[in-house]
Amino acid sequence: MSAFCSRSTGPVAAAELFRGPQAEVTVAYQPLASPGGIIVQAMQHDRILRRELARRGMSLRFVAAGKGGDVIPMLQKGDAHFATMADMPLIEAVNVVPLSIIGQLKRNYAMVVGPRGLSAKDLKGKRIGNAFATTGHFALLKVLSSAGLSERDVALVPLDVNLMPDALRNGHVDAFAAWEPTPSLTIGRNPDRYGAIGRQQSISFLVSTREFTAQHPEAARQVAAALVRAMHWFKVDRSHVITAVRWNIAATEALTGAKPQVGEREYAKSARADLEELGYSPKMSRSLTSKRSLLLDAQEFLKSIGKVPRAAAEDALIGSFTYDIVEDVMKKPTQYYLSRFDYAP
């Protein structure tokens, strides 16, 4: 990690100055999600980001949350300006607070995990560990639906995702629904015992309140630049992933009060696979807002089973995608220091 003193990116417009009680810019994130947890850890340690925001009268704070649904009220109340969230909480969020979806953090799978040989139809009457209103919950709903079942046919056991593997191993639940890296790590450690009963593609994003991006567009671009820079940092040296994994394991322990069971190298291998799936870039494809996109299909499915209001409009979701922020930053790699790294230990 090399030190770098950033040059000025030009005069700071008066409208960009962020003074007074809101001088603190807050990013809410989930350290239990991969690879979003390690990406945000890199952003949190990014001195360039902090310097650029300081020039605009802004400080930076990161708040860890257990799941995406926990950050929705923070965005609503103005307690967070940026957040990471996956598909199901995102669909819920855009219907209650105007958002700008800035960049993509993952494209992997949420899974229902249980004993090998158990099928989706075998879940009837079973106890299933679940974190409500998460991408894991969405995967469970889809898997149950594929077998002609619904939530009423199973016993949902509310669990934090970090507790699910032990609950399954100890027989407290018969299966669990979770997002990466928990499913793959659980199966990888016990390949003869556990398998994926079903899975659903899961995507997650960095979002901002629309109010913040409208009032402070350059500050939003600086945060986007830190996101791009973090992924590039991971790409240029594989050891950087291990560094961020260590930071994230510490954040996870602080959040949950327990040391994660996963080892550093095991976690890093899973995170690298997720980063490679995105090409180490947060740039979003226009297909995300096509008529047959995963998100629109998910919204229609959630409406059909009463998980989001039937009045939820496609426009609220599609209109939240703000492609140009990351795209503008990537067109100006020198101005935004995309290949310069200065990460605090």
Each model region followed by its residue ranges:
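Short secondary-structure transition/capping segments
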Residues: 95-97, 114, 188-191, 207-209, ...
